[in-house]
């Protein structure tokens, strides 16, 4: 059976260049690699992690010359792999190098261990990701306030910060002709982070228009712009890069213009192990961090105002647990004395990815597009089955998830599930993304955007420098997640040779002969379980929501029950989003930086 869609058919842009050797040396000369240079010192703010959010917030705080900021980053600045980092067309070549942390999961479904790709170095995952630049659905961000009680976290507010972060570059006439549409009202033009069309100078592939014409013939909208609050349909997308096609990573955008500030120091090659606290009448107050490379070689540095955790969704919860903040049973097992009970490390929401690839005839040239497909487009003939699951299984799923250790409160988790049900059935929110790439092939990378599975990440020992933890996304422990991934992958195969695409289709290579052309969705489920990979978009391990619903941080990113401690990275969004996540994280970082500065002004 075929899917319904088939059967119903602060540098100016001109001057930005690749890093020069002289520039490399100058930046390196301003960075610190000797931990004794900061040992025992006091800064206003100590930031654990020099990735997207860490460097963004550090840049904003240090605009005030009176504020002293220290960033501690486990990795380094650039590397021997620098040219690969700078070229967004070399995506994937950087994996396995010195800037890829490559966390491993516990054994997953079918006893497969997953690799979690994550950037290591100043810039974090912006050094290695696909630099795709899209925004989520309005109702998703609105739910952060409406459902989870986070005042001020609504689309209209967050959209302003996403625009403030952006320095957008409109497409040229040739790019528009190829299918690169643009709505200037949905973009910022005066921000720090450069974004615009990816263009390697080759002709544009006719496959872009062929895909648009194929899906639009069956009622799928061709989107003018995926940044306006309802990314459903198909369009080409901008990327996080400069006009000369150099990657606009967070180090280039936020560090390079500011590394010479006297009040901003960056320490590399050191890992933050835990937060230091003083006990007060109002509860534990963060006063610094312990950092280093191993149990015998570590140091303390102090924060007069706040400690800000920006180590990412896999690591920030571990730092909290090593510091004594978390679930008592987890901390007891690891040998850590509990300081505060919070559901740290739970509610992990990552996505899964599969690929469909075919050869292409007479379709040379470049181009990337995305098809954000809604629930019925993805499930097709199985839509009624999916609706029935959402109407009858939420209670059961919540109970099973809590029993497996993905969350701690059945009632609160059901509220999350009801929110997702509303998105999918009532709000036309995209359920899956089919990311389309050409260059002599028809290639879809496909992921279910809205997972109901909840995983976890927890420490396994009391030594933060041993790197012992359990990263357990629990992929496909929910039947709708598996059905959705299978149906979306099946849809990718069908689209590859449907409509106008058919004249360019020259035979499938993935899955190819590994799966019959008339495979059922059940056969696709078996295939998916053996051939998926993590999508590396995990969020919510330190969820920003009301404490009653299972939150770890409040609407200002402050850790509940503490003073002087915030989590400011991708571990705090309470939901997944139907987009690539950089735009959300940048907007989030700017909003949090503003909140930190407001508190600083009050204290001063």
UniProtKB/Swiss-Prot annotation:
FAD binds at residues 52-53, 73, 125, 129-130, 132, 272, 570, 582. PROSITE patterns: GMC_OXRED_2 (PS00624). It catalyses: beta-D-glucose + O2 = D-glucono-1,5-lactone + H2O2. GO terms for biological process: secondary metabolite biosynthetic process. Optimum temperature is 35 to 40 degrees Celsius. GO terms for molecular function: beta-D-glucose oxidase activity; flavin adenine dinucleotide binding. The active site is at residue 537. Optimum pH is 6.2. Belongs to the GMC oxidoreductase family. Glucose oxidase catalyzes the oxidation of beta-D-glucose to D-glucono-delta-lactone and hydrogen peroxide in the presence of molecular oxygen. The enzyme also catalyzes the reaction with D-xylose but at a much lower rate. Shows any activities against D-fructose, D-galactose and D-arabinose. The enzyme is cytotoxic for a series of bacteria, yeasts and filamentous fungi and acts primarily via the liberation of H(2)O(2), which is a harmful oxidative stress-generating agent. This is Glucose oxidase.
């Amino acid at each position: 059976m075929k899917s319904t869609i088939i059967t119903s058919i602060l540098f100016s842009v001109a001057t930005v260049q690749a890093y020069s050797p002289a520039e490399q040396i100058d930046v390196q000369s301003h960075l610190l690699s000797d931990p004794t240079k900061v040992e025992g010192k006091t800064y206003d703010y100590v930031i654990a992690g020099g990735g997207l959010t860490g460097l963004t917030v550090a840049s904003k705080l240090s605009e005030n010359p009176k504020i002293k900021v220290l960033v501690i980053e486990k990795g380094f600045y650039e590397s021997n792999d620098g040219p690969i980092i700078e070229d967004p067309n070399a995506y994937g070549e950087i994996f396995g190098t010195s800037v890829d942390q490559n966390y491993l999961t516990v054994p997953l479904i079918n006893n497969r261990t997953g690799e979690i790709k994550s950037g290591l170095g100043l810039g974090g995952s912006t050094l290695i990701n696909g630099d795709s630049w899209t925004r989520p659905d309005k109702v998703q961000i609105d739910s952060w306030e409406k459902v989870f009680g986070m005042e001020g976290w609504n689309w209209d507010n967050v959209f302003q910060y996403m625009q403030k972060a952006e320095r957008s570059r409109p497409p040229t006439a040739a790019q528009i002709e190829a299918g690169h549409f643009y709505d200037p009202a949905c973009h910022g033009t005066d921000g720090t982070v450069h974004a615009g069309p990816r263009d390697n100078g080759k002709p544009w592939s006719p496959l872009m228009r062929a895909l648009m014409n194929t899906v639009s013939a069956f009622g799928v909208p061709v989107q003018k712009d995926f940044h306006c609050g309802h990314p459903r349909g198909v369009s080409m997308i901008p990327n996080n890069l400069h006009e000369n096609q150099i990657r606009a990573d967070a180090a280039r955008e936020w560090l390079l213009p500011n590394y010479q500030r006297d009040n901003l120091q960056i320490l590399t090659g050191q890992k933050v192990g835990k937060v230091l606290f003083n006990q007060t009448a109002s509860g534990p107050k963060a006063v610094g961090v312990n950092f280093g490379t191993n149990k015998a070689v570590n140091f303390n540095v102090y924060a007069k105002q706040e400690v800000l955790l920006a180590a990412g969704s896999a690591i920030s919860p571990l730092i909290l647990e090593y510091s004594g903040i978390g679930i008592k049973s987890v901390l007891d097992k690891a040998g850590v004395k509990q300081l505060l009970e919070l559901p740290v490390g739970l509610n992990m929401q990552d996505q899964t990815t599969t690929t469909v690839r075919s050869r292409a005839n007479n379709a040379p040239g470049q181009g990337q597009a995305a098809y954000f497909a809604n629930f019925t487009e993805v499930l097709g003939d199985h839509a009624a089955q999916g609706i029935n699951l959402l109407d009858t299984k939420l209670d059961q799923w919540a109970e099973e998830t809590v029993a497996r250790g993905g969350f701690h409160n059945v009632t609160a988790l059901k509220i999350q599930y009801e929110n997702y049900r509303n998105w999918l059935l009532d709000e036309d929110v995209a359920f899956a993304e089919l990311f389309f790439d050409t260059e002599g092939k028809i290639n879809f990378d496909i992921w279910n955007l809205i997972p109901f599975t909840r995983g976890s990440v927890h420490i396994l020992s009391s030594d933060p420098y041993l790197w012992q933890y359990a990263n357990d996304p629990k992929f496909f422990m929910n039947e709708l997640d598996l059905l959705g991934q299978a149906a979306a992958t099946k849809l990718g195969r069908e689209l590859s040779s449907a409509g106008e695409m058919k004249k360019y289709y020259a035979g499938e290579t993935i899955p190819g002969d590994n799966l019959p052309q008339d495979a059922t969705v059940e056969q696709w489920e078996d295939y998916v379980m053996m051939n998926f990979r993590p999508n590396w978009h995990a969020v919510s391990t330190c969820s920003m929501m009301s404490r009653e619903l299972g939150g770890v941080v409040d609407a200002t990113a402050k850790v509940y029950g503490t003073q002087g401690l915030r989590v400011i990275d991708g571990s705090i969004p309470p939901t997944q989003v139907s987009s690539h996540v950089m735009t959300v994280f940048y907007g989030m970082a700017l909003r949090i930086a503003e909140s930190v500065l407001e508190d600083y002004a009050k204290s001063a």
